[in-house]
């Protein structure tokens, strides 16, 4: 059995070693819940990686947004290149859920755009969990949403052996039942093709395809190959092909599911008719009977997930199968930034329920649609075998549950938590201007946090009027634009960023050495102890880090934040003195999800492809074919690196080449 093998040039330092040992010992001893309370920049991810190697358990890591999940995924791929590191997030590029707004009598149909590469990565995660134990899955709260039954997904797989006798026609039917499509012209993910005595299958969860060679009905050769270049990668004696979708239904489950749906429809129609809701009853009857017919004939219907409970033979109210059900019982969970992630998990069910309740009440869906849902918080907690909560500011639930809380407050870089000063609100604008000017002289940046949009706008106008380069970030700014603004701040395109909540990015800003917190003494979640400590941590990447709290009194949250920050500074200073470390600002390349190296590759690829594409009309068919192969390889490389927007650009170029050549 393959073991987790951590590969890194670094060794644990500071208090990482103590944290790794304490938490690993706790896991081995059977402790259910523990907390790693680690400051910003202390190397919490590296500590997590060392724990995984020490305990050798299949691991799920949950983050609270896709951006941070992608960062963690890349880091763990680097730490464990010989093991299965997978990525499981929502596969929707765009998602408008089905909904009904009674006040406006407005029904909104479900509308979604699925990201093909993320769909592959999700399937790859469950495939790895079925086939091996050395698996790390990095996920968002997508892991608490309903997924197909793991038993069905596993039991429906096709096992193919060299020397086996099987009719090609029979194998074709088996693949179609697993929701693979036949396409003899183009071999793409989730498809297969047959040419003479050769069948090629492109599993929905892989980047490579399989080629089966037959001698009459005997399989004489099984090979894996690159579907773009055609290069043979490996020969096999046997292999398994898993379904192309997570939601699959064994044939023998269909009759029972249909009976349950029909019975529920009859019961629900009786209720609606008794209540005098004749329009709702007729609407529900028409919609559901159409779905029943589709399920009966095709084994599928639009919105099939709304019938997941009868299909899976679940009782009303029973939790759905989720990614957790694909893990073995002894799995380990890390909840990153748990002070945000834990409450987020708890909020998912209620939001989903309120939307679907309207659909049921007004005759758009059967009550079983309510069981196509995320896990409730108590169901989620029951699913956890052993968990480590990771945060600089763990919440009350983590602290209450944990049998041990392990601190990690020493930064190997020697950087100290910033100095905190308090300044009265009177004259705060002038004081901020003076502090920002000092930072500009040092080629450093500033963050200013306000409580209201009006204050942010006024401060932006004031500082801009004094000749400073300022930008204001607000809730209506899209995620991609937010990342671009943060990159601009780091690159020095402007000097000051003003906003209400600048915590949610989770992106390092080592150039920021000054943070001004307006209305620091106000009561509320934006000025709680947790929020203030997180804000202060933003300036902990710079050797000149300084935070000024503008307030007319010292609130309890301010007092606790200052005391905790001073405690951490003292520990770090003692460590630095003992080891002769002089703190230096972290030097980090300016990047978002993409590294600059990848940007250069992208620019080079587009520059190289551009002239060819522009002169397509003079290219002969052979040259066009070569160009398409080259572009497909580039597209696959971007997708590999989670550079989905760049992959989409190349995909569009490929379509352009094919269109002109047709």
Swiss-Prot record:
Keyword Phosphoprotein (UniProt): no
Cellular component terms (Gene Ontology): cytoplasm; excinuclease repair complex
A Pfam family the protein falls into: ResIII
Subunit structure: Forms a heterotetramer with UvrA during the search for lesions. Interacts with UvrC in an incision complex.
Binding site for ATP: 38-45
Protein name: UvrABC system protein B
Keywords: ATP-binding, Cytoplasm, DNA damage, DNA excision, DNA repair, Excision nuclease, Nucleotide-binding, SOS response
Covalent S-S links between cysteines: none
Keyword Iron tagged: no
Family: Belongs to the UvrB family.
Origin species: Treponema denticola (strain ATCC 35405 / DSM 14222 / CIP 103919 / JCM 8153 / KCTC 15104)
Residues of the UVR domain: 625-660
Role description: The UvrABC repair system catalyzes the recognition and processing of DNA lesions. A damage recognition complex composed of 2 UvrA and 2 UvrB subunits scans DNA for abnormalities. Upon binding of the UvrA(2)B(2) complex to a putative damaged site, the DNA wraps around one UvrB monomer. DNA wrap is dependent on ATP binding by UvrB and probably causes local melting of the DNA helix, facilitating insertion of UvrB beta-hairpin between the DNA strands. Then UvrB probes one DNA strand for the presence of a lesion.
Sequence motif: Beta-hairpin, positions: 91-114
GO biological process: nucleotide-excision repair; SOS response
Domain notes: The beta-hairpin motif is involved in DNA binding.
Organism classification: Bacteria, Pseudomonadati, Spirochaetota, Spirochaetia, Spirochaetales
GO terms assigned for molecular function: ATP binding; ATP hydrolysis activity; DNA binding; excinuclease ABC activity
HAMAP family for this protein: UvrB
């Amino acid at each position: 059995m393959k073991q987790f093998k951590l590969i890194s040039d670094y060794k644990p330092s500071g208090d990482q070693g103590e944290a790794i040992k304490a938490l690993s010992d706790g896991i081995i001893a059977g402790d259910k819940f523990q907390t790693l309370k680690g400051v910003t920049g202390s190397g919490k991810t590296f500590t997590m990686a060392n724990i995984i190697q020490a305990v050798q358990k299949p691991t799920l890591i949950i983050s609270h947004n896709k951006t941070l999940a992608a960062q963690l995924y890349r880091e763990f791929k680097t730490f464990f290149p010989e093991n299965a590191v997978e990525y499981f997030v929502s596969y929707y590029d765009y998602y408008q859920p089905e909904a009904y707004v009674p006040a406006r009598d407005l029904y909104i149909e479900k509308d979604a755009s699925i990201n093909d590469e993320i769909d592959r990565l999700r399937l790859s995660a469950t495939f790895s969990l079925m086939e091996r134990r050395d698996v790390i899955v990095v996920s968002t709260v997508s892991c608490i949403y309903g997924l197909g039954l793991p038993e069905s997904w596993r039991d429906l797989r096709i096992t193919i052996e060299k020397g086996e006798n099987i009719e090609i026609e029979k194998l074709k039917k088996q693949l179609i039942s697993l929701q693979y499509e036949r396409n003899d012209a183009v071999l793409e993910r989730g498809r297969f093709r047959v040419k003479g005595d050769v069948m090629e299958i492109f599993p929905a969860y892989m980047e490579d395809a399989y080629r089966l060679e037959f001698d009459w009905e005997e399989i004489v050769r099984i090979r894996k190959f690159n579907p773009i270049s055609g290069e043979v990668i490996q020969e096999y004696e046997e292999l398994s092909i898993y379904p192309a979708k997570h939601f699959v239904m064994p044939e023998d489950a269909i009759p029972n599911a249909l009976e349950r749906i029909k019975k529920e429809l009859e019961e629900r129609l009786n209720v609606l008719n008794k209540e005098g809701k004749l329009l709702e009853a007729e609407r529900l009857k028409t919609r559901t009977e159409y779905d029943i017919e589709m399920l009966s004939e095709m084994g599928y219907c639009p919105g099939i997930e709304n019938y997941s409970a009868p299909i899976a033979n679940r009782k009303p109210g029973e939790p759905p199968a989720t990614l957790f059900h694909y893990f073995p019982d002894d799995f380990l969970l890390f909840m990153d930034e748990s002070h945000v992630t834990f409450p987020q998990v708890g909020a998912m069910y209620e939001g989903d329920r309120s939307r679907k309740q309207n659909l049921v009440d007004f005759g758009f869906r059967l009550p079983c649609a309510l069981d196509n849902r995320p896990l409730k918080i108590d169901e989620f907690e029951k699913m956890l075998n052993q968990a480590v909560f990771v945060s600089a500011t763990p919440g009350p639930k983590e602290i209450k549950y944990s049998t041990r809380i392990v601190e990690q407050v020493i930064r190997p870089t020697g950087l100290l938590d910033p100095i905190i000063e308090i300044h009265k609100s009177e004259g705060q604008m002038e004081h901020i201007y003076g502090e920002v000017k000092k930072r500009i002289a040092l080629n450093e940046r500033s963050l200013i946090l306000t409580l209201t949009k009006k204050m942010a706008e006024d401060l932006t106008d004031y500082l801009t009027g004094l000749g400073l380069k300022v930008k204001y970030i607000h809730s209506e700014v899209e995620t991609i634009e937010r990342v671009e603004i943060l990159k601009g701040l780091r690159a020095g395109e402007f000097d000051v960023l003003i906003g209400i909540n600048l915590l949610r990015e989770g992106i390092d800003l080592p150039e920021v050495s000054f943070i001004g917190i307006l209305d620091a003494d106000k009561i509320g979640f934006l000025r709680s102890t947790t929020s203030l400590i997180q804000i202060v941590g933003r300036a902990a990447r710079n050797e000149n880090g300084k935070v000024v709290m503008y307030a007319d009194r010292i609130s309890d949250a301010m007092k606790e934040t200052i005391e905790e920050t001073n405690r951490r500074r003292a520990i770090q200073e003692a460590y630095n003195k003992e080891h002769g470390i002089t703190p230096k600002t972290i030097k980090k390349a300016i990047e978002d999800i993409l590294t600059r190296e990848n940007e250069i590759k992208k620019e080079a690829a587009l520059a190289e492809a551009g002239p060819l594409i522009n002169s397509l009309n003079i290219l002969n068919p052979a040259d066009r074919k070569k160009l398409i192969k080259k572009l497909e390889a580039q597209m696959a490389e971007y997708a590999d690196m989670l550079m989905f927007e760049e992959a989409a650009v190349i995909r569009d170029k490929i379509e352009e080449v094919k269109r002109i050549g047709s």
